[in-house]
Amino acid sequence: MAIYGIGTDLAQVSRIAAVLERTGGRFAEKVLGPDELRVFHARRARSEARGIAFLATRFSAKEAFSKAIGLGMHWPMTWRALQTLNRPSGEPYVVASGELAAWLDARGITARVTVSDERDYAVTFVVAEAPDHVAAARSGAAS
């Protein structure tokens, strides 16, 4: 396995809060996958600030992932096709669905993700890995 790509994103939590307020909550429904949306609603019910911070980290994760795989937010990378969930230990991991999952599987691409938030910022770093020949082809290196 070799590095296929890296991506990072920094989201301003107050900006995410403003968009959420302006859209009456539709922004969360547009961006979050079903499992993420359940966690968002549960966290927001306990603490508005923690719910919005969660939304900001997940928005940031999708942006960083789209950069790591080199597609940006273009098909098959869609907002809801990628979810960042947490293991019981708290470790984040990504789960793709639909056409994005098929696209990643066809290339053997996997990813590692880390997310963090502090006051008004949420940051994500993603490392996408693929078999050596796939990563080499993307970088233009001879196989």
UniProtKB/Swiss-Prot annotation:
InterPro entries to which the protein is assigned, alphabetical: 4-PPantetheinyl_Trfase_dom, 4-PPantetheinyl_Trfase_dom_sf, ACPS, Ppantetheine-prot_Trfase_dom
Localization, per the record, is: Cytoplasm
Q: Does the keyword Lipid biosynthesis apply?
A: yes
Judging by the UniProt lineage, the source's domain of life is: Bacteria
Q: Which reaction does it catalyse?
A: apo-[ACP] + CoA = holo-[ACP] + adenosine 3',5'-bisphosphate + H(+)
* Reported cofactor(s): Mg(2+)
Q: What is its EC number?
A: 2.7.8.7
Q: Quote one Gene Ontology molecular function term.
A: holo-[acyl-carrier-protein] synthase activity
Pfam families, from UniProt?
ACPS
Q: Which residues bind Mg(2+)?
A: 9, 63
The UniProt keywords, alphabetically, are:
Cytoplasm, Fatty acid biosynthesis, Fatty acid metabolism, Lipid biosynthesis, Lipid metabolism, Magnesium, Metal-binding, Transferase
Picking any one GO biological process from the record gives:
fatty acid biosynthetic process
- For this UniProt entry, what's an example GO CC term? cytoplasm
Top-level EC class as recorded in UniProt: transferase
Which family does the entry's similarity section mention?
Belongs to the P-Pant transferase superfamily. AcpS family.
Function, in words:
Transfers the 4'-phosphopantetheine moiety from coenzyme A to a Ser of acyl-carrier-protein.
Name this protein carries in UniProt: Holo-[acyl-carrier-protein] synthase
